[in-house]
Amino acid sequence: MKLALLDDLRTQNPIVFNISNFVTVQDVANGLNALGASPIMSEEPAEAGEMVGLAGGVCLNLGAFTQAQIQQIRTVGQQANAQHKPLVIDPVAVGAVQYRKQVATGLLADFHPDVIRGNAGEIAALADISWQAKGIDAGEGAGDLVAIAQACAQKLDCVVILSGPTDIITDGTRVVKVLNGTPLFQVHVGSGDMLSSIVAAFCAVTPDTFEAAQTACLVFAAIGQRVVQTVPDVGAGSFTVHLLDALQSTTVAQIEAVAAYE
């Protein structure tokens, strides 16, 4: 685990171009900025090529979209591939809504992601494995989560992050589990979206997308855990504020002190 990538990120200040969920766009922008990256957001297809050109990494969030936005997502994804920019996809609720799965499947036929990050229900859906998802939440299902993540990675030929109490990161063969975290991530709408964009930021500072993905997950989970451990009586509202503070101030040494992964 190359936690020194966090220092590289803060030194290089990579631009991350986001097609964002309007519900969480401010959380994503603030989270990236606090960590040390530079977020840009746009929904104008005419500038997609130039925006991708400026970016070190691209993150496409499927949380809230219209037909026009689907075309924008497609254009940006194709531009990212054409310009060889690392591309992260967050397939929100594809496990709960069939239309969303159809849209995501169509998009993934038109461009290739380097990393896909989702919960168990979303990753299972993309792997065509049965799972009972609940809206944007993972829901409940019976299955080997590592096998599900590996199946998705092998099917789509990319790194997959299956987020949950334990984050599973795999390229289809190698597997890393991040054991850090806090249940407060589940009550902070936008924490998953924030992580997806942070993954893109780490991908911008190393060509090794598997290393970038696992490091991003560990950094984010460990920082969230430290907030709960160091802030008295933190709740859903105050957690959001303290998380941003911690994204800005937490050092590599502090993360190493609590890091738990296998």
From Swiss-Prot:
Official protein name in the record: Hydroxyethylthiazole kinase
InterPro entries: Hyethyz_kinase, Ribokinase-like
Pfam families assigned: HK (PF02110)
Enzyme Commission number(s) of this protein: 2.7.1.50
Signal peptide: none
Species of origin: Levilactobacillus brevis (strain ATCC 367 / BCRC 12310 / CIP 105137 / JCM 1170 / LMG 11437 / NCIMB 947 / NCTC 947) (Lactobacillus brevis)
SUPFAM superfamilies xref list: Ribokinase-like (SSF53613)
Keyword DNA repair: no
MF terms (GO), sorted A to Z: ATP binding; hydroxyethylthiazole kinase activity; magnesium ion binding
Binding site for ATP: R117, S163
Catalysed conversion reaction: 5-(2-hydroxyethyl)-4-methylthiazole + ATP = 4-methyl-5-(2-phosphooxyethyl)-thiazole + ADP + H(+)
Binding-site list for substrate: M41, G190
GO biological process, one term: thiamine diphosphate biosynthetic process
Key words of the record: ATP-binding, Kinase, Magnesium, Metal-binding, Nucleotide-binding, Thiamine biosynthesis, Transferase
Pathway info: Cofactor biosynthesis; thiamine diphosphate biosynthesis; 4-methyl-5-(2-phosphoethyl)-thiazole from 5-(2-hydroxyethyl)-4-methylthiazole: step 1/1
Job description of the protein: Catalyzes the phosphorylation of the hydroxyl group of 4-methyl-5-beta-hydroxyethylthiazole (THZ).
Cofactor(s) required, per the database record: Mg(2+)
UniProt record similarity statement: Belongs to the Thz kinase family.
